[in-house]
């Protein structure tokens, strides 16, 4: 029996799709020094190679791929999209606008000057900004019929040029941004580490790394005479055991009676106390407070310690500093704060935003009470709310199909923007109502990554047939344009942030990488600053940038049509 694998690939879109995906994802795992190629580049380049070899993709799977991707982008941005308008929000929005407008106008100018056409211009913009949402927005603006194409304009040719321009400039945009944010502080004669420490002092932040061990442990001690003398009749609140040791007094046994103390309780000699704290805190406890003998008492130690992720929701907490929650008095331990999928600097003085996720450890009932005060405990479920997912998906398509007519001018959002807005709404509602629209993080990541990968396969296969011709004709010009669109908007944004917005350079560079939605570049800034402080800036611009980038893709096509 003879199997002609090449013929099978030509005959089966499904087989071709997953073969390209498999090879592309393998290529994405390749590392060149500290640089990993990544799934997007790997899949796109593999698809271009297969397209150049004559393989074609005729299925409509591409549409499902880009719609899934952009909808999931909206869900991720939703919890924090409206919170951007709080502290420093206007700075982040303005900075994002300046960077994207500079990139948009520069791309249009270069494309007009070099006569590259709308498709190549949109591809250069999306690739140089490493923004797939911009590419999705541009392609959807054409496919949705919202634009009146000039007579004899070949839509497929314009779409293919988008894919080629994106492929040629994506790597330039990624590596270029990483190099710019790495060496710009040196050129500006700035010590980014010092700047990060400066903003930390100004805002009362610290930059301690998250603990390696998140779950506290329980140990029990009998209070000896030295500790009792040191306490001297003071209450637990007055002695400040937690600030000194990191341990919290969870239970006291006195004269055989168990009690759960509050801040007004007084420890006496002979009491047996159950302390909850991280292992390193217990290790230091005897030295600091000269406790008596450690005891084993099953009833005293019978506590259920849990670690939960609490979503910030309640208006009375949003906008306040974490320290105001008085976690120590509530017997709860903060492990980390996550905002827009980015772990924030480990500090209790961070201002809380709606949708922030606090990982908290402590006794089960105490953690539950804290969650009721600030929001809700994230659902521990692997089941997706498919009813909400499909309903909001349909809503996005309906929003995208609406067109407004003003005389001879017809205006509509298109599927990309409609799905993005519907995703934002679903994500926002999820941050406010724990039972609405729950999608497990793993499922959301799968849908987003798979949708993006399928979209890249289709784009690459369709554009691959003409990539060598374009490389020989305009390859150098496209790469040159990509370098300019990568670097100049960043420089303009940096100068605007320093001179006009008066932003701290560490926060500013983090915000610039967020405006470009480029997490690898943020890692470079964090490394240069020897701090995670820049992540605050990244989270400030990331959510709104996803929306603006999608719109930018639509707008650049509108310059021509």
Swiss-Prot record:
Q: Report the InterPro entries cross-referenced here.
A: AAE_transporter (IPR050144), RCK_C (IPR006037), RCK_C_sf (IPR036721), Transp_YbjL_put (IPR023017), YidE_YbjL (IPR006512)
**Gene Ontology CC:** plasma membrane
Q: Give the record's GO biological process terms.
A: potassium ion transport
Subcellular location(s) of the protein: Cell membrane
In the bilayer, the protein is annotated as: Multi-pass membrane protein
Which molecular-function annotations from GO does this UniProt entry contain?
monoatomic cation transmembrane transporter activity
Q: Which residues form the RCK C-terminal domain?
A: 206-291, 293-376
Signal peptide bounds: none
Q: Does the keyword Membrane apply?
A: yes
Please give the superkingdom of this protein's source: Bacteria
Keywords, ordered alphabetically:
Cell membrane, Membrane, Repeat, Transmembrane, Transmembrane helix, Transport
For this protein, the record's PROSITE patterns field holds: RCK_C (PS51202)
Q: What is its main location?
A: membrane
Gene3D superfamilies of this UniProt entry?
Regulator of K+ conductance, C-terminal domain
Q: Where are the transmembrane segments?
A: 8-28, 37-57, 66-86, 90-110, 161-181, 386-406, 409-429, 450-470, 476-496, 541-561
Family per similarity comment:
Belongs to the AAE transporter (TC 2.A.81) family. YbjL subfamily.
Task: Identify this protein by name.
Answer: Putative transport protein ASA_2308
Write down the species: Aeromonas salmonicida (strain A449)
């Amino acid at each position: 029996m003879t199997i002609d694998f090449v013929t099978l690939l030509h005959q089966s879109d499904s087989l071709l799709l997953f073969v390209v995906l498999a090879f592309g994802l393998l290529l994405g795992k390749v590392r060149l020094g500290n640089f990993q190629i990544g799934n997007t580049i790997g899949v796109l380049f593999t698809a271009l190679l297969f397209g150049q070899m004559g393989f074609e993709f005729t299925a409509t799977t591409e549409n499902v791929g880009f719609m899934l991707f952009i909808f999931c982008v909206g869900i991720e941005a939703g919890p924090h999209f409206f919170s951007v308008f709080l502290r420093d929000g206007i700075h982040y929005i303005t900075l994002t606008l300046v960077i994207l407008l500079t990139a948009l106008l520069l791309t249009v100018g270069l494309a007009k000057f070099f006569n590259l056409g709308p498709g190549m211009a949109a591809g250069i913009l999306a690739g140089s900004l490493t923004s797939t949402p911009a590419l999705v927005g541009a392609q959807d603006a054409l496919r949705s019929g919202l634009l009146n194409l000039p007579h004899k304009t070949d839509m497929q040719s314009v779409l293919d040029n988008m894919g080629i321009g994106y492929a040629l400039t994506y790597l330039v945009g990624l590596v270029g941004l990483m190099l710019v944010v790495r060496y710009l502080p040196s050129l500006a004669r700035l010590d980014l580490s010092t700047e990060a420490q400066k903003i930390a002092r100004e805002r009362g932040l610290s930059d301690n790394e998250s603990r390696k061990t998140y779950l506290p442990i329980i140990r029990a001690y009998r209070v000896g005479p030295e500790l009792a003398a040191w306490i001297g009749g003071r209450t637990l609140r007055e002695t400040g055991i937690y600030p000194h040791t990191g341990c919290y007094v969870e239970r006291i046994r006195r004269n055989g009676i168990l009690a759960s103390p509050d801040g007004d309780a007084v420890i006496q000699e002979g009491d047996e106390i159950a302390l909850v704290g991280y292992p390193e805190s217990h290790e230091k406890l005897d030295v600091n407070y000269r406790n008596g003998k450690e005891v084993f008492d099953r009833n005293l130690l019978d506590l259920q310690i849990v670690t939960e992720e609490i979503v910030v929701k309640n208006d009375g907490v949003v906008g306040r500093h974490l320290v105001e929650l008085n976690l120590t008095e509530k017997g709860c331990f903060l492990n980390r704060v996550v905002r827009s999928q980015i772990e924030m600097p480990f500090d209790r003085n961070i201002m809380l935003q709606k949708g922030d996720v606090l990982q908290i450890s402590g006794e089960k009932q105490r953690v539950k009470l804290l969650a009721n005060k600030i929001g809700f405990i994230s659902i521990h479920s692997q089941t997706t709310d498919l009813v909400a997912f499909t309903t909001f998906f349909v809503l996005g398509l309906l929003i995208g199909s609406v067109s407004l007519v003003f005389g001879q001018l017809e205006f509509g959002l298109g599927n990309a923007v409609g799905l993005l807005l519907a995703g934002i709404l679903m994500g926002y509602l999820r941050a406010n109502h724990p039972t609405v629209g729950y999608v497990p993080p793993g499922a959301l990541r799968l849908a987003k990554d798979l949708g993006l990968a399928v979209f890249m396969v289709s784009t690459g296969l369709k554009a691959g047939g003409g990539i060598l011709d374009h490389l020989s004709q305009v390859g150098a010009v496209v790469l040159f344009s990509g370098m300019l669109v990568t670097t100049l908007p960043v420089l303009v944004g940096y100068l605007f942030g320093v001179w006009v917005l008066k932003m701290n350079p560490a926060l500013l560079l983090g915000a610039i990488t967020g405006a470009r939605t480029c997490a690898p570049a943020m890692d470079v800034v964090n490394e240069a600053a020897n701090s995670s402080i820049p992540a605050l800036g990244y989270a400030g611009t990331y959510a709104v940038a996803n929306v603006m980038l999608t719109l930018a893709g639509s707008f650049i096509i509108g310059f021509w049509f």
